Amino acid sequence: MPAKRQQQTIKRKTAGKKSSKKMNQQRSTLLISVHRTQAVFLLLLFAMIGVLMGIGVWKAGSAIFNYVDRTSRYDKMIVAAGRRNGVYPPLLKAVIWKESRFDASARGSKGEIGLMQVMPSSAVKDWENTFRRQVPSDGALMDPALNIEIGSWFLGRALERWKDYNDAEALALCEYNAGIQRAESWKPLLHDGKVMPNIDIESTRKYVRDILERRDEYEHEWNWEKLK
């Protein structure tokens, strides 16, 4: 091979190697850039997830705290009213739990108001006539102390009415939820008989069952006797 052609061949090979090396370097730089971008994206993603989880945990914790605070803030009122009106405090608290979930501003679809969802046309009116006192407005029934006082008095009167029955609490709850006429129709023939099989309204049967179960829970978990 002539010397000149040999030199040209060597130059082409050298140039090809340099070009290939340059392309490899560019490819490596591009890959590094892509990896860095992916790493930054993942870091940002994890950071966002962490923030969202933190917010979620905080909100959940806050909700739990608020609920626990709401379920216990009326304890002294419940115990005092229960003792005055002859209602076992765990039962009274269970009724409030069922009626309003401890929401003092709760309103029912039929005009029920407050913690114990008292009815202005029945419980409130009876209480006013008995004690010769006037509730100034429906809004006043959102006052926790007044609402619990009227509701516990109404429930206590029902308990007194059914005291000769073994299922006095269940009958009183039937009266509180569905009225005295229905409670009369559901009472057992014998004083030691059971009420639940006679209740033909599913919502009332569930109402009574839920409250009695919750009463049992409060009886064992709530240290109400020490409250004054």
Predicted regions and their residues:
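N-terminal export signals and maturation junctions of secreted/periplasmic proteins
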Residues: 25-80
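N-terminal Lys/Arg-rich, disordered targeting/topogenic segments
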Residues: 1-37, 187
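Catalytic glycan-binding domains that act on GlcNAc-containing polysaccharides
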Residues: 56-228
